[in-house]
Amino acid sequence: MKVIFMGSSEFSVPTLEFLIGSQHEVLAVYTKAPKPAGRGHLLTKTPVHAYADAHNVPVRSPASLSSDSERDIIEKYMPDAIIVASYGMILPRWMLEVPRFGCINVHPSLLPRWRGAAPMQHAILSGDAVTGVTIMQLNERLDAGDIFLQESTPIGSRENIVALSERLSSMGGRMLLKVLDNLDTMRSVSQDDAGATYAAKPSEFCVNFNDAADYICRQVRAFYPRMFFFLDGKRVKLLEADNYELAGAQIGDVVNDELHIQCGNGTVLAPKIVQPESKKPCDIRSFLRGFRGCVSNVLQR
C-alpha cells in the first residue's frame, strides 16, 4: 500500500518507523515547518522531519494544506491512504476524499473518551486507571470517525506523560500496521457520541495550592515538566511529588522542614524532585540545603 504520513511530535516517530520498516511504501512525509528553538533560537526540524530525512523520505512542511497547489501535489501522489499521528494541523475536507481508503488517524485514547488535542494528559489528570490507542477513520468532526481497532493499557500510578506517550506511540505504530495489512477486509464501527469527552490543550501550569494535593500530583505527571510554583519570588518547577491527608495549617503554608505544603481539602503536597530557575533538577533535600530564602509560605506570584 502507498501512503502519505502526516505527523510532527515525538509521539509520531514510532508510527513512521513502523511504516518505513514495513511492506508499505511511504510516498512522502508532511510535518510542521522548522521553528526557532533553544537559547540560540536556531531553526529546528520536528522529530518526524529529522527521522524522515535520515531515511531519505521526501518531506513537505506547508504552512497550510488548503492551497490548490498543495492539493495538486497530494493528488499526484495518488496515495491509497493518508496516515495521521499528532500532526497538529487540520486536514481540509477534500483531503479526506483523495485516498482510496481515506485518512486514518492514530489517536492515543479509548475513543470516544478524550477526543481532542491532549488525550493522554487528560487521562492522567482525571485519574483514569486505563487508557489506550484507537486507530480510526478521519471525518469532518473532531476525532469522531469510525473505529478500526482499539487496545487498552493500564496507567501506572506514578507514570508521567513522557513515559505514557512512549508506550502508547509504540502501541499505535504496531496497531496501525495490523489495520493496514487487513484494510481490505477490516470492518469499522461507529463511535457512541453520548460517551464523548473532550481534552482541551492546557494553558495554565502554575500550581494552585487551593486544589487538593492528589490532583496537583496528577497535574505534575500529566503536564511534566511544566508545573511550577513560586518560592521566595523565584519560579521552581515541580517534577515529582507525593501527597497525604493532614489539616490544620493555612493553604500555602510550609508544614515541615522538607517543604511539605498545605493544600486544599485537608491535604498536603510533598515535593520530591524540583528544578530551580536556570538550574538542574534535584531532590528536595538537595534543593533545601542550597536554598537561602524564606520558606514559610509559598503562595507568591
Swiss-Prot record:
Disulphide bonds in the chain:
none
Catalytic activity, EC: 2.1.2.9
Gene Ontology cellular component annotations, sorted alphabetically: cytosol
- Which residues of this UniProt protein bind (6S)-5,6,7,8-tetrahydrofolate? S109, L110, L111, P112
**Family matches, as InterPro entries:** Fmt (IPR005794), Formyl_trans_C (IPR005793), Formyl_trans_C_sf (IPR037022), Formyl_transf_N (IPR002376), Formyl_transf_N_sf (IPR036477), Formyl_transferase-like_C_sf (IPR011034), Met-tRNA-FMT_C (IPR044135), Met-tRNA-FMT_N (IPR041711)
The GO molecular function terms of this record are:
methionyl-tRNA formyltransferase activity
Q: Among its keywords, does the record have Transferase?
A: yes
Question: CDD domains attached here?
Answer: FMT_core_Met-tRNA-FMT_N, Met_tRNA_FMT_C
Under the heading Gene3D superfamilies, the entry gives: Formyl transferase, C-terminal domain, Formyl transferase, N-terminal domain
What reaction(s) does this enzyme catalyze?
L-methionyl-tRNA(fMet) + (6R)-10-formyltetrahydrofolate = N-formyl-L-methionyl-tRNA(fMet) + (6S)-5,6,7,8-tetrahydrofolate + H(+)
Alphabetically sorted, this entry's keywords are: Protein biosynthesis, Transferase
- Family the entry assigns: Belongs to the Fmt family.
NCBIfam families assigned to the protein according to its UniProt record, in alphabetical order: fmt
- Show the HAMAP family listed in the entry: Formyl_trans
Reported function: Attaches a formyl group to the free amino group of methionyl-tRNA(fMet). The formyl group appears to play a dual role in the initiator identity of N-formylmethionyl-tRNA by promoting its recognition by IF2 and preventing the misappropriation of this tRNA by the elongation apparatus.
Protein's name according to its UniProt entry: Methionyl-tRNA formyltransferase
